[in-house]
Amino acid sequence: TFETATRNTLDLASIPLLKTMSHLPIIVDPSHATGRRWMVESMAMAAIAAGADGIMCEVHNDPEHAWCDGAESITPETFEHMMGDLRKLAPIVGREI
């Protein structure tokens, strides 16, 4: 797209579509998809709800001083919180973590 508010566009509709096209696990990267750390957790939750089999994201203990991808990196504490939320969400949408 030509959207400039985020780094890229995370097409959540592609997750269930890909599930019909492949036997392979679908892994979503909300860090690079958005380029903004404050969006990572909500996009990770949306991806799991849409059927993603896994999440990969940038984690850094000091994102402001990361050599690369700092703007999209979450802290270990944020990652821990996100994983707690994902563990609560997963069974609600019929998924396991």
Kindly give the residue locations of the regions a language model identified.
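Catalytic alpha/beta core domains of metabolic enzymes, predominantly
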Residues: 1-59
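C-terminal helical cap(s) of enzyme catalytic domains, especially alpha/beta-barrels
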Residues: 61-95
